């Protein structure tokens, strides 16, 4: 078991933010405080394998809150955006707790691998004090990395990742229609909608040639070999006719995005 208290400096994007008068209004923000409690046990299965189970609790205080949106910064950031570049206050709270199972096998009988499963909750408070799910509150997280060593320096390996349904902030379509192309997020609906499960399997094959003076390695890899869709929030555009002309009165429609691409790649290295 272990216990620790940690402090984190506010992000530079928040400390460097200026209001319209050119004043650094976030420079007095407090350090984010987090208290961690971890307990568990592990058990060796033979000479090469180990099983471990851990429970954890993390308590956060003095967490930054967006003054404009009234929510914790932990409830933002699911998209590609700069966090903290706004006025914030540091009186938010949060908590994360869960249980993790881990199985690990070192190279034995030509096989090696690590499998882990984590079940957890994560929530943070905003200006109202109400706890809302963080953007990474997927509840279920599974990962596997393993491989099998064949003869003559061939190796096949795989990586599997599964992520449960993740909360996201939907758009306010009425306000977004008036401000398009700037889409307006509706933070009052945070937690009401979730993305689909994320599930991806990657496969890789390696071959290595060893000589006295040098070694040569080659690999071929396929990402998302099962062609699973990557879950993303809905995207919208202006409705158009068959000629591409915007239809009046203007309205928004959901844009279909290709999200299940299989990505092959290869590479090599030469060492001497």
Name each model feature, range by range.
Residues 1-5, 41, 53-57, 115-119, ...:
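Transmembrane beta-barrel strands of outer-membrane/channel proteins
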Residues 2-37, 57-82, 159-182, 230-233:
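Surface-exposed extracellular loop regions of Gram-negative outer-membrane beta-barrel proteins
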Residues 3, 124, 141-210:
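C-terminal beta-barrel architecture of Gram-negative outer-membrane proteins
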Residues 26-30, 50-112, 252-267:
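Outer membrane beta-barrel strand-and-loop segments of large Gram-negative receptors
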Residues 47-51, 110-113, 153-156, 212-216:
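Repeated loop/turn-to-beta-strand initiation elements of outer-membrane beta-barrel proteins
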Residues 57-59, 80-170:
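Gram-negative outer-membrane beta-barrel transporters
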Residues 61, 113, 162-181, 196-200, ...:
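C-terminal beta-signal and adjacent terminal beta-strands/loops
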């Amino acid at each position: 078991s272990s216990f620790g208290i940690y402090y984190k400096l506010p992000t530079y994007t928040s400390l460097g933010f200026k209001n319209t008068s050119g004043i650094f209004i976030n420079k007095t923000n407090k350090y984010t405080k987090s208290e961690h409690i971890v307990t568990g046990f592990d058990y060796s299965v033979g000479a090469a394998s180990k099983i471990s189970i851990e429970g954890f609790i993390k308590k956060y205080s003095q967490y930054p809150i967006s003054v404009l949106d009234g929510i914790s910064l932990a409830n933002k950031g699911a998209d590609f955006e700069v966090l903290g570049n706004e006025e914030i206050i540091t009186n938010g709270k949060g908590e994360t707790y869960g249980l993790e199972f881990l199985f690990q096998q070192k190279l034995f009988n030509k096989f090696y691998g690590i499998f882990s499963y984590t079940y957890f909750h994560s929530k943070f408070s905003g200006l109202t004090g109400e706890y809302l799910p963080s953007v990474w509150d997927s509840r279920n997280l599974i990962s596997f990395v393993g491989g099998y060593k064949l003869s003559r320096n061939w190796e096949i390996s795989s990586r599997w990742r599964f992520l449960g349904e993740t909360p996201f902030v939907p758009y306010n379509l009425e306000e977004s229609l008036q401000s398009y192309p700037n889409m307006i997020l509706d933070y009052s609906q945070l937690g009401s909608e979730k993305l689909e499960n994320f599930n991806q399997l990657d496969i890789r094959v390696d071959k290595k040639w060893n000589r006295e003076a040098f070694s040569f390695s080659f690999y071929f890899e396929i990402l998302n070999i099962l062609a699973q869709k990557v879950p993303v929030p809905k995207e919208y555009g202006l409705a158009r006719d068959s000629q591409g002309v915007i239809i009046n009165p203007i309205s928004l429609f959901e844009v279909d995005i290709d999200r299940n691409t299989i990505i092959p790649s290869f590479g090599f290295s030469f060492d001497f």
